[in-house]
Amino acid sequence: MSAATATGLGATVDVAHEASSIRVGPRSDAADLRVTMGEPLRLAILVGREPANVAAALATSLAANAELVLTLSTTGSGTVIDRASAIREARPNAVLAIADKGDVDGMIELVEALRLACAGGPHTPHLFVSAEDKARVRIGASAGAVPVEAIPAPTTRSAREAVVARLRALRRGGGDIVLRDEAIEAAARSLVLATGRATLVLDVSGESTSLALVRPDGSLIAAHSRLGIGPGADRIVARSGLDRVRRWIPRPIDAPALLERVFNRARWPNAVAPSVLTLALEMALSREALAHLLRDAARAGLDRAALANTRWIVATGDLARFPRAAQTALVVIDALLPEGTTLISRERPDALVVAGAIATRATADVSGMTEDLALVTSLWPKRAITLSVTDESGTIEEKVARGAFFLMPTTGSVRLAFSGSAAREAAAPLVLGVIVDARGRPLDLPPRDAERVPTLARWYSALACLPIEDGSL
């Protein structure tokens, strides 16, 4: 694959993976750009009682792909010593302080706890303060030797982007690199410029998970985390719980055995799934990484419905590299639970990440870098309806009742129509075809293995995701 800008000039990009990098482009001696995760950023948040400021701080943390290690509020209980101990144990690299109007004294108490926590310590975090001018002077004076930098209140789009850019600079260190989350956002923007339609890019790699929604007006909704299906797999278990991963495995497996597999996967950089069970585990981890990030985005006040119901979803990273296209499609459907009709596509290996890296420096050409997998129609009919699918082979009609989940393979361009509705949908040639999902929202899995395993097996078999026999792997 050749990586090129819109002007035709070639560029060579190194894309870092778990324990190696892949070079894409014409040069063999060196790379023009490097895409990496950057340095981990441990972020602590100091906030008041204002809900908008709390949500803005959480959204900033997600946009900057910072690990939120501590949140302290001026309304919380505890002495200065208690707060200082909490900060010292959290070991933040950066602290984001957003002061409410009229509550400067409370923020000063939190900053004094920060100063106490850093006294005599080997590492001093950067303190970013958002407050009115007079209040910021008082807060800065209480910080002592802690370096203080003024930032705008991240409650508006432009201000949040400025704060995120500053936090990302800390992750770059002294290197001239493109952060992977930056490349994902730039790739989404390039796709929107090329197609004119809103695009959600989902990226799941060994060490990170990203959601980047760009609309035709240029607005961006983005969230990133250090959850992954490789070295970041143990983080998923630590934050979501083992049972939430286990519930997606279409076979009975006890918790200790599953936990061992998760931690073994975290210790195997660039591992290729050696068995069907391991592949099912990676699919389960991908679902939970995306679902957890969506929940974090909702808590931060981001538009979860807009993220989940975008009409075009593009998968990148390890999510796009599952051996079967149906595996990518099933993970996206189960994690996002889209409603209506959605087109699911995937990048060609590392193509969009490379294009995104180039797009941070110039205009990138993204034509031919994605392939359309499936047109997914999600519905919950009161009574059975008829779905008509027309492709090059003719028209096929299927009855759809509640609980249905199946694939209708297609050839060439596709058109959809529903009985009793004037709505029509169309798509270019698809790798899989049309996926009909009438399982309902939210998607509830039976808690007992005797019911859960056959249910999952039916869903996997419906899309021919995995070789399943006798109701299990």
Residues covered by each model-derived region:
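N-terminal phosphate-binding loop and flanking beta/alpha elements of the actin-like ATPase fold
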Residues: 24-171
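Early-domain small/polar-rich strand-loop-helix modules and first-structured segments
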Residues: 1-49, 53-83, 220-226, 230, ...
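Histidine (H) residue identity feature
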Residues: 17, 123-126, 224, 292
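Glycine-rich beta-strand-to-loop/alpha-helix junction loops that act as flexible
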Residues: 97-100, 125-132, 205-207, 310-319
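Gly/Thr-rich phosphate-binding beta-strand-loop-beta motif of the actin/hexokinase/Hsp70
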Residues: 1-25, 41-46, 84-103, 191-218
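Helical "lid/coupling" subdomains associated with nucleotide-phosphate turnover
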Residues: 176-201, 209-473
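Conserved phosphate-binding catalytic cores of ATP/NTP-utilizing and phosphoryl-transfer enzymes
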Residues: 2-10, 30-38, 72-90, 169-199, ...
